[in-house]
């Protein structure tokens, strides 16, 4: 990646991060008024569990994907770069499904451990987003490897806007049934915002599909094609130290 491209990419992601934090502040203040301290407590109990599992399931894989894709594109190996994306997509989808199942399975145990059944609904509400974020990580890594930071920035802002609009709306609509429902509504907003963000990045990918396919067609075939296992192994080796 050239110096200008790196600076431009860092600037785009930096702006997206600032905008995301700004929107996030607008989310937290009214949410506290809607679901009150007990609801915020439930939200804050559920969210760290989600983040912990998300970190385990994705680790540094988006960065590893970006690195391997960029290295292959620099050599003109567009076909191999796209193959890395396809393999990482499948791997992250499987990891996302496993993480979702684990969270759903341990939720009753976690609730029993902290002696608070009200946390069950919020945790189950956020479990599916582990899959959607994991899959989106593959797309983000691929685009970043192509020196395209825009898709990552757009999806980050989409997530925050979705969480703000959908999360607050559902929290307000459901809090009358109980604080756990209000907290779950806010968290469903997080899940749906990830679904929307995934849809956005798939749309962006499809817009660039003809360009990607042209690069694949004109890419020379490698004499030695790395196996899927070796690609996964390399991804993990790069990702683990991150």
Which functions belong to the PLM regions below?
Residues 44-70, 131:
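Small-residue-rich midsections of specific transmembrane alpha-helices
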Residues 1-23, 79, 83, 222-242:
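N-terminal membrane topogenesis motif
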Residues 22-40, 111-112, 173, 239-242:
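Helix-terminus/linker motif at the lipid-water interface of multi-pass membrane proteins
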């Amino acid at each position: 990646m050239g110096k200008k491209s790196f600076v431009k990419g860092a600037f785009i992601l930096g702006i997206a991060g600032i905008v995301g934090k700004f929107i996030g502040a607008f989310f937290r203040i009214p949410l506290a008024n809607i679901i009150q301290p007990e609801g915020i407590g439930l939200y804050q109990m559920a969210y760290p569990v989600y983040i912990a599992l998300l970190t385990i399931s994705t680790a540094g894989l988006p960065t590893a994907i970006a690195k391997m894709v960029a290295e292959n594109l620099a050599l003109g190996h567009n076909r191999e770069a796209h193959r890395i994306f396809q393999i990482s997509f499948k791997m992250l989808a499987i990891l996302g499904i496993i993480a979702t199942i684990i969270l759903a399975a341990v939720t009753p145990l976690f609730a029993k451990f902290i002696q608070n059944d009200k946390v069950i609904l919020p945790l189950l509400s956020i479990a599916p987003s582990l899959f959607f974020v994991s899959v989106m990580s593959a797309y983000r890594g691929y685009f970043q490897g192509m020196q395209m930071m825009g898709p990552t920035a757009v999806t980050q802002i989409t997530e925050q806007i979705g969480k703000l609009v959908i999360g607050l709306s559902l929290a307000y609509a459901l809090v009358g049934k109980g604080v756990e429902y209000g907290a779950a509504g806010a968290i469903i907003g997080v899940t749906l915002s990830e679904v929307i963000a995934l849809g956005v990045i798939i749309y962006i990918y499809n817009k660039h599909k003809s360009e990607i396919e042209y690069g694949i067609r004109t890419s020379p075939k490698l004499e030695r094609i790395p196996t899927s296992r070796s690609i996964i192994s390399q991804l993990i080796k790069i990702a683990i130290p991150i």
